[in-house]
Amino acid sequence: RNGVTITSFPVIHIHNGAVGYRLDYAGRSVVFSGDTRPCRHLVEACDGVDLLIHETFPTAAVLSQKAGMPLNVAEMIVNGAHTSPAMAGMVFERAGARMSAMWHLVVDHETVGPVFSEMRTRHDGPVVISQDLTVFNVTKEYVVARQAIIGPFRWPVVGASNTQGPPMSAPLPPPQWWSTALITD
């Protein structure tokens, strides 16, 4: 509609059904990964893309230390459901976007350096860490990231609720296509 094309494609994240998106408009394009492990379908969707916004989790060692969890649990989270900085760098390199952005990433002054260092082992192109209110300007000439300036923050007011979600069930086995779509190196 109005010259905008949005295309979804499957990605790999815990349960079958996760998707990423590609948005094309006026000769410009953006790919958003959603939560995913490194995935062939995502790289294929990046053909000629201007901006790739890809989820990235901190290294397992950093997650373990900062979240106070055992290293083996952090490794399972980062490598089993998300994308490490090094693997994000590999995806950025294969995708060939004009600019890449890491999102879904909590960093502080102690961890931003290690995240970039690990990502840089696989990719040396333009990359930013996006956060809430990051704005991207994508034009024929350039792709720029900046932070929006907003008025005073207001916490949302949450009303009373007695809604309960469905009970959690055991995860289903992964679909067969994951084995050929997963990028491991």
Regions from the PLM with identified roles:
Residues R1-A45, D132-L172, W177-D185:
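Core dinuclear metal-dependent hydrolase active-site scaffold
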